[in-house]
Amino acid sequence: MTVIVLSGPIGAGKSSLTGILSKYLGTNPFYESVDDNPVLPLFYENPKKYAFLLQVYFLNTRFRSIKSALTDDNNVLDRSIYEDALFFQMNADIGRATPEEVDTYYELLHNMMSELDRMPKKNPDLLVHIDVSYDTMLKRIQKRGRNYEQLSYDPTLEDYYKRLLRYYKPWYEKYDYSPKMTIDGDKLDFMASEEDRQEVLNQIVAKLKEMGKFEDDWKPNLVK
């Protein structure tokens, strides 16, 4: 039984890889609520006003998901609570949160992480980070077509997206809740190429075998 969490910037392909990987491993996918998120469009319309509310919304849903995943112990999550502070801190750094909101957010996050520490299974088994360049990120954002994410909707998103990518490297380096690995999302287009998809799956399975989570003769479910 394994719990795998994915990470990566907006448009990296986390939800797509979650579906591919969960089917391959025979586990259950957990998807972050985006299309039915009532706060996300408001945030893109007025980031300063809604940054705190959006992050509390995400924090709550990610906390619920990781609790369920750790209890079930057989899941792939397309994003997790461990990544949450990265987004809020970036928004705070560019003036989209008051000092009071920053204090409230981190107190809430601390309380939630403390509750996870009391669970029988405290951490995921593996973090899979999808590393992409700005060009790849933008191409995938354009392809999925959410209007409020497009540079044509708000040209200032260019700075936001580039800044977000800069925040990921130190976050990944500091992450220590579980073993971790990186997928090269520029080189391996696992959404469009069957060959690349299989290579990504092979890399993840090899890591799980190295960790002792899978036997050497483990066989996957068939991927259609």
From Swiss-Prot:
Active site positions, chain numbering: 78 (proton acceptor)
Source organism superkingdom: Bacteria
MF (Gene Ontology): ATP binding; deoxyguanosine kinase activity
Binding positions (ATP): 8-16
Swiss-Prot/TrEMBL keywords: ATP-binding, Kinase, Nucleotide-binding, Transferase
Function of the molecule: DGK/DAK plays an essential role in generating the deoxyribonucleotide precursors, dGTP and dATP, for DNA metabolism.
Family per record: Belongs to the DCK/DGK family.
Protein name as annotated: Deoxyguanosine kinase
